[in-house]
């Protein structure tokens, strides 16, 4: 569920913020287990919530940190896995789930700004596909938030082991991936 992470690692639904001008909001984006499908219950990973909870109520220059767990797994991309897009030889048609998640994050940022949180005090963060989402949002809309924290932004499969990145180098591995899976490779390049 979406809501603010508490110090005790639970999630309190809602967007209640007392004194929004003196808060720093970190929007946390989870990863995705099923890259393009809708799975409502897959958005709270206990180990990640515990890490995020350690930031709650910390202060920077008199401003308290609040961490918002943003559950955005309840919708699918236009070509979900059911349509076999991962094995497609053609480019992805429509919006991928990650593109839609970027849009949802931008909407959430605007809600926080409307409540009174200054843009310069809103930070996007994410793990795994949420980390890639963070990079996508910041590269396309750097003016919308103060910055981002992206960690372990592995998304779209384990290219490192499957394509022997360590042995052949990243360029050769990505070329092999593009040859075997041109549809996903095009999407990866576009994003």
Across the structure, where does each feature detected by a protein language model lie?
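Cap/lid segment of the alpha/beta-hydrolase catalytic domain
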Residues: 37, 65, 69-99
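Alpha/beta-hydrolase fold active-site loops
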Residues: 23-24, 65, 121
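Hydrolase active-site cap/lid region
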Residues: 136-188
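Gly/Ala-rich beta-loop-alpha elbow adjacent to hydrolase catalytic centers
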Residues: 125-130, 134
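A short loop-to-beta-strand scaffold at the N-terminal edge of the catalytic core in hydrolase folds
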Residues: 1-17
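Short, surface-exposed "cap/lid" segments of acyl-processing enzymes
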Residues: 16-60
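Alpha/beta-hydrolase active-site loop
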Residues: 89-115
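Short, solvent-exposed loop/turn and secondary-structure capping segments
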Residues: 37-41, 79-82, 136, 160-163
């Amino acid at each position: 569920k979406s809501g603010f992470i508490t110090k005790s690692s639970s999630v309190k639904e809602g967007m209640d913020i007392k004194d929004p001008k003196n808060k720093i909001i970190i929007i946390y984006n989870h990863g995705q287990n099923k890259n393009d499908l809708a799975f409502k219950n897959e958005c709270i990973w206990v180990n990640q919530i515990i890490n995020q909870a350690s930031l709650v109520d910390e202060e920077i220059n008199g401003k308290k940190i609040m961490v918002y767990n943003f559950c955005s797994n309840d919708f699918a991309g236009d070509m979900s896995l059911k349509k076999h897009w991962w094995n497609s030889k053609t480019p992805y048609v429509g919006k991928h789930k990650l593109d839609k998640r970027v849009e949802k994050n931008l909407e959430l940022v605007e809600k926080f700004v409307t409540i009174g949180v200054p843009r310069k005090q809103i930070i996007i963060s994410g793990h795994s596909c949420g980390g890639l989402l963070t990079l996508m949002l910041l590269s396309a809309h750097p003016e919308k938030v103060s910055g981002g924290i992206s960690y372990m932004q592995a998304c779209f499969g384990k290219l490192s082991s499957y394509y022997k990145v360590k042995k052949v180098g990243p360029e050769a591995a990505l070329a092999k991936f593009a040859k075997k899976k041109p549809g996903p490779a095009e999407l990866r390049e576009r994003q």
